[in-house]
């Protein structure tokens, strides 16, 4: 088991990153945490407001592509955990270069800093989407990467950079590939918070095509526990770990479950035009992470009920995010479903 005195958490003001910081502060309070975050639209200082002014915590507003800044922060820590990324597939179809810059070049900057300062671990948070669409079976860590969107390709590129640093320079590398994650503090562009916040306002719940695309949904608390376990206990010799529940759920089930919890009519579901290159199914083999001692504690049903309650109880967090820019993006992304003329 590894122990750390000081960690740099890149992207710690985002959804999974802020929940990971919250986990560390509650379970490993002896670790000093520096959060580096660019505070793009999806990074929110309110996610970490409870830690401001507390001992052992520092927030730095900055970009992981800023080599001088990253080097100065890396000099004072034992390890880097990198959540920093552009992460939304839909936006990657509109602004692909931003994803390549952050997810590939930014990862390289962090790897170089970790190498230079002889860090004990560099942990890269990746995604199951690097495997591409899986029609049958489940993706294992050694499978070939076949990304099909600018987002998943940029994450795969970041992984390749990190693995190259491990092979060329001996960088002590760990990588997690998580499935679709949901829970509190998730920016309302991803499916679950879009459905919940739209349902609160009695707006249509958009589902691509016929809503049949299949995903594995893991609650953010479980995902963060798995990341923490990998960081502290996973052997470096075989560094990649899938994180998921093994339970497959399609969009129709998610939307109907949200409406049932909230007592809203199913007529709110609206099918919209499919996005280009939409992967129909992701599925992970999670044997390696379960062999390490992890298993999910929060079922999809329990997690969804808790998540609905959180958004209902925290309109002051999400309503300001649904601003003019948000709706501009929303209208560009969710287009009416049309049928071919006869």
Predicted features by range, described:
Residues 157, 161, 165, 195, ...:
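Hydrophobic alpha-helix immediately C-terminal to the catalytic Tyr-X-X-X-Lys motif of short-chain
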Residues 20, 62, 79, 193, ...:
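C-terminal substrate-binding subdomain of Rossmann-fold SDR/epimerase-dehydratase oxidoreductases
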Residues 51, 137, 188-196, 273:
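A glycine/serine/threonine-rich, flexible loop-to-helix segment
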Residues 1-181, 306, 314, 320-342:
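N-terminal Rossmann-like NAD(P)+-binding domain of SDR-like oxidoreductases, especially those catalyzing
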Residues 16, 43, 68, 186, ...:
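Residues that form or flank phosphate/diphosphate-binding pockets in enzymes
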Residues 133-135, 184-186, 190, 288:
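Short beta-loop-alpha junction of Rossmann-like oxidoreductase domains
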Residues 19, 46, 71-72, 91-94, ...:
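Generic recognition of short, well-ordered alpha-helical segments
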């Amino acid at each position: 088991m590894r122990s750390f005195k000081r960690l740099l958490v890149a992207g710690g003001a985002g959804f999974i990153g802020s929940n990971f910081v919250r986990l560390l502060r509650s379970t490993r309070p002896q670790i000093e945490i520096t959060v580096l975050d660019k505070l793009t639209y999806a990074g929110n200082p309110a996610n970490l407001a409870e830690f401001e002014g507390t001992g052992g915590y520092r927030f730095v507003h900055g970009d992981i592509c800023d080599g001088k800044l990253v080097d100065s922060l890396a000099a004072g820590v034992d390890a880097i955990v990198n959540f920093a990324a552009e992460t939304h597939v839909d936006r990657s179809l509109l602004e692909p270069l931003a994803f390549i810059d952050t997810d590939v070049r930014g990862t390289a900057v962090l790897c170089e800093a970790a190498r230079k300062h002889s860090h004990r671990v560099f942990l890269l948070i990746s995604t199951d989407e690097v495997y591409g669409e899986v029609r049958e079976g489940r993706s294992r860590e050694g499978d070939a990467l076949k990304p099909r969107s600018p987002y998943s390709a940029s994450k795969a590129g970041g992984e390749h950079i990190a693995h190259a640093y491990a092979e060329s320079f001996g960088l002590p590398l760990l990588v997690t590939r998580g499935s679709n994650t949901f829970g509190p503090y998730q920016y309302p562009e991803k499916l679950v918070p879009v459905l919940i916040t739209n349902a609160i306002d009695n707006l249509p719940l958009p589902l691509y095509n016929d809503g049949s695309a299949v995903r594995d949904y893991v609650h953010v608390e479980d995902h963060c526990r798995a990341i923490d376990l990998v960081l502290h206990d996973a052997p470096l010799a075989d560094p990649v770990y899938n994180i998921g529940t093994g339970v497959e759920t399609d969009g129709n089930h998610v939307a109907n479950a949200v409406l049932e919890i909230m007592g809203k009519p199913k007529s709110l579901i609206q099918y919209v035009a499919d996005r280009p290159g939409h992967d129909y199914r992701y599925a992970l083999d999670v044997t390696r992470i379960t062999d390490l001692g992890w298993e999910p504690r929060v079922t999809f049903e329990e997690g969804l009920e808790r998540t609905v309650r959180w958004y209902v109880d925290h309109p002051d967090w999400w309503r300001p995010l649904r601003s003019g820019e948000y709706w501009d993006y929303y209208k560009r992304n969710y287009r009416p479903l049309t049928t071919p003329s006869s």
